[in-house]
């Protein structure tokens, strides 16, 4: 189903909703303008980083002197945390510790990964886009996030999906068809019914949603 989906996100600066493919360039225009305005204000290094799992993505602006732990915590809060599992960053050629500074890891356009839960692992990828000199207060700023995906019920093929059955081919069901599926699948009401959420962790372990940007964490309207 993933290849049939299209992904788009809202720009934090102008609220324009754009396709995933053009969002990076669009955000760069805003960031370059802010960098020019902040040039005389003793700015600090901020890293524009894209986190993705296919059609799901986050655009982050992270203070260069912040530790990678800041990103780890943010990813858990918005996308991943369910049962207190362990997590960490990695790269095929070098180690990435949560104590490393963000600006040191993303000095170039490096691509690393982040794993959450070493049992039922959810892996996402992080890529450094560009560093900017900016005068900001926050350590991590959410520049954009994919809007809720248009997942459709597998049974009626009409209404937005609200739940997943984790034992029946991970099929999606709307609220109405979820009730019907309970009559067909004994495990659905017991443990296999999981909510549709805007996260790569959807349907895994006990994940039911994040704690940041919750208005974009549900079913598409």
Describe each model-derived feature in a short phrase:
Residues 1-221:
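Short linear regulatory motifs enriched in tryptophan with gly/pro/ser
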């Amino acid at each position: 189903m993933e290849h049939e989906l299209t992904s788009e996100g809202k720009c934090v600066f102008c609220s324009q909703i754009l396709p995933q493919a053009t969002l990076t360039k669009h955000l760069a225009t805003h960031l370059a303008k802010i960098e020019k305005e902040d040039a005389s204000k003793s700015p600090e290094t901020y890293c524009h980083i894209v986190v993705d799992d296919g059609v799901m993505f986050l655009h982050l602006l992270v203070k260069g002197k912040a530790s990678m732990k800041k990103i780890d915590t943010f990813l858990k809060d918005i996308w991943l945390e369910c049962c207190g599992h362990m997590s960490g960053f990695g790269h095929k050629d070098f180690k990435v510790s949560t104590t490393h500074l963000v600006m040191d890891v993303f000095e170039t356009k490096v691509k690393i990964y982040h794993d959450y839960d070493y049992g039922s692992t959810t892996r996402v990828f992080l890529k450094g886009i560009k560093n900017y000199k900016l005068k900001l207060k926050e350590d991590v700023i959410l520049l954009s996030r994919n809007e809720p995906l248009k997942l459709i019920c597998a049974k009626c093929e009409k209404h937005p999906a609200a739940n997943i059955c984790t034992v029946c081919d991970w099929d999606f069901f709307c609220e109405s068809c979820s009730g019907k599926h309970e009559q067909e699948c004994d495990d659905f009401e017991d443990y296999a019914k999981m909510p549709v959420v805007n996260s790569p962790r959807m349907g895994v372990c006990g994940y039911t949603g994040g704690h940041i940007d919750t208005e974009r964490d549900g079913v598409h309207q």
